[in-house]
């Protein structure tokens, strides 16, 4: 510790305060000539001292110093150099996961804060923010060397690192800490900058830790940056987290945005030119620019609002920066004179700032080509605040100080920010630490409420949610079977709106056929509840149509005096379904039930498939004899597999694993005397090997007539006509689809599975690439089972 103190004394900053008062004892003022000479000497000494000060700044600090000087030209940065040396010495033996010296992290955090325009005290705290937690440097020693203010900031960041938002057991700790931070928000700003650099270098951590940190960033840190008004930091945190948590979806969004770039840029250039021309004619000085696109925001709008990519307005956005507030309102008039404003889309955040920080005018108009165009209009000062939030706010407060040094009471002035005031109000009003913690955590989620299950679990819902929304948030089946609700111990109507902090209990029906009511669609507000209810009724209609179709087919076959079970078998119906352009047999039955095709027509196609009534009767009789069935093997049934020592034995490729040439295979003798061919890694291998006497060797022997069953799975961002585009891509490659299934998850990811026959599996790689190029598809691969 003594060595540290010695270093600190050697690097004690030279205080340079301009004006004659400092040099008065050395400056005679008897004559004008003498005074002029003395002034030259003072300037020379000041120049030498400033040169000496600059020479003590480490080269690695020069970028930070250059940025900070833009905001605080007269700042004395000697203390920053001293903090860097202490941090460098304390972290000397430590490395980051990337292999870089640990000091690169606090230095990067300080650089981020310098770019935000934070004061010297914050930069010093940033350089030292990990020394107390990760080295033997005590908080007392740090405070003694750099002052109580720096010590307070470092202590706040250290405590924030030691707790996990959301743990009720830590409620009291977080309550005290957040209250302290509300009085000095720089602690929060340092933490946000710390997380931003960690997210930028997250690739060096294990995947599971990356995912945990990214999830915490999305749920807590990014909303915190949003509440602090730090938009530029918030966007970057969200996009970095998105790339870690959903890499394939992230890449697909990036690809989609890049694909629209040329047409979008042309469109924006046309819009900018028109706005600039009209503003000039109206004598309004302003800068017009395109707004950057943020991938997480685009993805969220696709999920939460259920929009297709092409319908997202944010892809085309304009920002107008004016000199004066009155010009902002005049600019709105200009924009509305050019294009028709959309009803309900004008918001005045200048008159009513959001969170007490953000100010801007928002409007959406029907722009050229009938496309929605989002426009933000603000002053340049408002724009700096919008980008840097409380950091910019703090910078303006600091401007009242001297040489960038914090005014002792400046922190109190931050209390004019609404959200910071709210934190202090919660501290006073919350009866329990857990109550305060919940107020903090869930207020970070804009336009959401939190309610509790009977067991005390927290469920977050959109504002205006009902018990039905709550039921679906708990589980889909709870939602489907919901018949009543009790809120805070009292029975309530299902359409009653829930409020923050309420305890909700759902009563469910035990009836096997229980389901949602169509009336629910009129009052539920959560996307999940709306989707699940809509899916239930769609599935119910499909199931009813499917059963009606089967009944109609049975009646029609019996009317013709034909054997139902033998005629309506999977192979024959699948052939007719393909001929009539249905993706599978179930779709054909559903079409019959819905009246799109008649049962009589389908039976006629079945008979034609079998060569007429006479041939059909003969064919059906032949199928009924197992021995005849084994002998019957047309050339088109060549599966490309031979059994050594047993030529002519009927072989069949197992549908449970759909082997193709190149796969390791094994044979299993069926009870009918044929051989079922499985992949050696088939999910049924373990059970088959329990009957080892029935396992035989088989070899691939494909010929030009061999046909193989292949199943692929396609994962894509759901959109209109997605299935059509995928099936069209397969059809263009002359692929005959035997079956297809599609499911859509709550986050608008469509998972499709297709089963088809291929003559040469070597072409599968090319086929997968073709499907992968369909818009919205981010992954496609072969799967084992065709079922």
Curated annotation (Swiss-Prot):
Name of the gene encoding the protein in the UniProt record: relA
A molecular-function term among this protein's GO annotations: GTP diphosphokinase activity
EC number: 2.7.6.5
Enzyme class, first EC level, given as a word: transferase
Designated name of the protein: Probable GTP pyrophosphokinase
Limits of the HD domain: 102-199
Domain annotation ACT: ranges: 711-785
Lineage summary: Bacteria, Bacillati, Actinomycetota, Actinomycetes, Mycobacteriales
Species the sequence originates in: Mycobacterium leprae (strain TN)
Classification via Gene3D superfamilies: 3.10.20.30, 3.30.70.260, Beta Polymerase, domain 2, Hypothetical protein af1432
Function: In eubacteria ppGpp (guanosine 3'-diphosphate 5'-diphosphate) is a mediator of the stringent response that coordinates a variety of cellular activities in response to changes in nutritional abundance. This enzyme catalyzes the formation of pppGpp which is then hydrolyzed to form ppGpp.
Pathway membership, UniProt: Purine metabolism; ppGpp biosynthesis; ppGpp from GTP: step 1/2
GO terms of biological process kind: guanosine tetraphosphate biosynthetic process
SUPFAM superfamilies, per the entry: ACT-like (SSF55021), HD-domain/PDEase-like (SSF109604), Nucleotidyltransferase (SSF81301), TGS-like (SSF81271)
Catalytic activity: GTP + ATP = guanosine 3'-diphosphate 5'-triphosphate + AMP
Cellular component GO terms held in the UniProt record: plasma membrane
Record flagged with keyword Transferase: yes
Region (Disordered): 1-40, 618-641
Domain TGS: 447-508
Amino acid composition bias (Polar residues), ranges on this chain: 1-12
PROSITE patterns linked to this entry: ACT, HD, TGS
Family label: Belongs to the RelA/SpoT family.
Keywords: ATP-binding, GTP-binding, Kinase, Nucleotide-binding, Transferase
């Amino acid at each position: 510790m003594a060595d540290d103190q010695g270093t600190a004394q050697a690097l004690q900053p030279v205080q340079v305060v301009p004006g004659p008062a400092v040099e008065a004892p050395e400056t005679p003022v008897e004559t004008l000539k003498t005074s002029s000479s003395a002034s030259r000497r003072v300037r020379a000494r000041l120049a030498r001292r400033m040169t000496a000060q600059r020479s003590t700044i480490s080269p690695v600090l020069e970028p930070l110093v250059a940025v900070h000087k833009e905001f605080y030209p007269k700042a004395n940065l000697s203390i920053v150099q001293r903090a860097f040396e202490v941090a460098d010495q304390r972290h000397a033996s430590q490395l980051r996961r990337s292999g870089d010296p640990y000091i690169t992290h606090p230095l990067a955090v300080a650089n981020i804060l310098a770019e935000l325009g934070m004061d010297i005290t914050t930069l010093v705290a940033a350089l030292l923010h990990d020394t107390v937690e990760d080295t033997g440097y005590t908080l007392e020693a740090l405070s003694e060397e750099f002052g109580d203010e720096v010590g307070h900031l470092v202590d706040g960041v250290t405590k924030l690192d030691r707790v996990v938002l959301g743990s009720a057991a830590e409620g009291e700790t977080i309550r005290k800490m957040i209250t302290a931070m509300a009085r000095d928000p720089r602690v929060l700003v340092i933490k946000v900058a710390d997380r931003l650099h960690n997210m930028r270098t997250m690739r060096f951590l294990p995947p599971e830790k990356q995912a945990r940190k990214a999830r915490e960033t999305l749920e807590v840190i990014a909303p915190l940056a949003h509440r602090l008004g730090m938009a530029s930091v918030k966007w970057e945190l969200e996009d970095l987290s998105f790339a870690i948590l959903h890499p394939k979806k992230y890449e697909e969004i990036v690809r989609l945005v890049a694909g629209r770039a040329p047409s979008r840029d042309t469109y924006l250039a046309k819009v900018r030119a028109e706005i600039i021309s009209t503003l000039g004619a109206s004598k309004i000085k302003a800068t017009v620019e395109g707004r950057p696109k943020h991938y997480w925001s685009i993805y969220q709008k696709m999920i939460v609002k259920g929009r297709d990519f092409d319908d997202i307005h944010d892809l085309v956005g304009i920002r107008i920066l004016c000199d004066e507030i009155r010009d902002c309102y005049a600019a709105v008039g200009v924009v509305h004179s050019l294009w028709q404003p959309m009803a309900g889309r004008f918001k005045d955040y200048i008159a009513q700032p959001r969170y007490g920080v953000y100010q801007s005018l928002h409007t959406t108009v029907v722009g050229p080509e009938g496309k929605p165009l989002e426009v933000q209009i603000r002053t340049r000062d408002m724009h700096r605040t919008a980008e840097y939030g409380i950091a910019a706010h703090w910078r303006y407060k600091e401007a009242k100080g001297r040489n960038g040094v914090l005014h002792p009471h400046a922190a109190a002035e931050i209390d004019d920010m609404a959200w910071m005031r709210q934190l202090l109000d919660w501290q006073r009003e919350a009866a329990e630490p857990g109550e305060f913690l919940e107020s903090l955590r869930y207020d970070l989620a804009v336009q959401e409420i939190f309610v509790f299950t009977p067991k005390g679990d927290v469920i977050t819902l959109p504002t205006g949610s009902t018990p039905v929304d709550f039921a679906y948030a708990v589980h889909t089946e709870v939602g489907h079977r919901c018949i009543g609700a009790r809120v805070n111990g009292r029975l309530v109507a299902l359409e009653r709106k829930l409020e923050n902090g309420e305890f909700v209990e759902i009563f469910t029906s035990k009836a096997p056929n229980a389901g949602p009511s169509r009336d629910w669609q009129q009052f539920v507000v959560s996307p999940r509840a709306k989707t699940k209810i809509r899916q239930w009724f769609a599935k119910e209609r499909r199931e009813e149509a499917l059963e009606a179709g089967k009944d109609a087919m049975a009646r029609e076959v019996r009317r013709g005096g034909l054997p139902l079970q033998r005629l309506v078998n999977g192979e024959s119906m699948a052939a007719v379904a393909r001929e009539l352009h249905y993706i599978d047999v179930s779709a054909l039955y559903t079409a019959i039930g819905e009246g799109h095709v008649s049962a009589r027509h389908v039976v006629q196609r079945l008979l034609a498939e079998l060569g007429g009534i006479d041939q059909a009767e003969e064919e059906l009789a032949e199928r009924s004899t197992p021995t005849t069935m084994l002998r019957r093997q047309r050339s088109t049934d060549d599966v490309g597999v031979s059994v050594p020592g047993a030529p002519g034995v009927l072989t069949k490729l197992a549908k449970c694993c759909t082997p193709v040439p190149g796969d390791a295979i094994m044979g299993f003798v069926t009870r009918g005397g044929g051989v079922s061919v499985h992949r050696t890694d088939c999910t049924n291998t373990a059970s088959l090997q329990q009957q080892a006497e029935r396992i035989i060797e088989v070899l691939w022997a494909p010929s030009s007539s061999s046909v193989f069953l292949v199943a692929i799975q396609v994962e894509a961002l759901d959109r209109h006509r997605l299935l059509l585009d995928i099936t069209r891509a397969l059809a263009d490659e002359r692929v005959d689809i035997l079956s297809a299934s599609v499911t859509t998850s709550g986050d608008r990811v469509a998972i499709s599975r297709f089963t088809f026959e291929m003559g040469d599996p070597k072409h599968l790689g090319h086929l997968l690439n073709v499907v992968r190029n369909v818009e919205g598809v981010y992954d496609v691969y072969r799967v084992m089972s065709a079922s």
